[in-house]
């Protein structure tokens, strides 16, 4: 069962403006990355379903985070079917994210009052997802849909939209500012926030610093 309510999840996404996206088969690495993000000001974290037994790792992370990072909202990403969504909800996922929009997932999450953010690449997909009860829709892959102008043009007719942007997002002022100015609700960030060499070197302080910088750029762009 989710620890945080839908309103709490959405409020944290909006307030911080960033959702780190990460997976590693080594649970200790996952713990260190989550802790580093937490210390950097992150309060919403997406663990992606991208490896064998990923759900088992997630279940342990939920229990660990409850004690070590009590304000961190953990959710599951790369969820493409209703069965997988149900599995992660049982393990305590506070939100579900997918690279695609699967209308079968929406009612599973809606019954639990858990946010479902599906991947969308057009106005039609975004609108259909909203009709299915998705409060935050994920534009993915961001680097292929037309850039910040796409978001701005979507927000014109669908001005009530809450768009989470993922793909081709970097923790730099030059990259983040145009997306924030275009009106995104929050951004999802993965490999650029967690370079392989940084993780391999166990340089958790560097990840904390990157998170702090990125959150600062987002806050600045919103002013």
Sequence positions of predicted segments:
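Helix-adjacent hinge/juxtasegments
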Residues: 73-75, 81-119, 123
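Glycine/Thr-rich beta-alpha phosphate-binding loop at enzyme active sites
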Residues: 43-52, 84, 89-91, 112, ...
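Glycine-rich phosphate-binding active-site loops on the catalytic face of alpha/beta enzymes
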Residues: 43, 96-105, 138-147, 183-204
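Catalytic cores of alpha/beta
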Residues: 81-91, 124-133, 169-187
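Hydrophobic faces of well-ordered beta-strands that scaffold small-molecule active sites
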Residues: 17-22, 45-47, 74-77, 96-97, ...
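Conserved N-terminal beta1-alpha1 strand-loop-helix module at the mouth
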Residues: 1-75, 79-83, 87-91, 181, ...
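Active-site beta-loop-alpha junctions enriched in small/polar residues
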Residues: 21-25, 48-52, 77-81, 101, ...
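Glycine-enriched alpha-helix->loop->beta-strand junction motifs that scaffold or abut catalytic
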Residues: 38-43, 89-96, 110-117, 131-136, ...
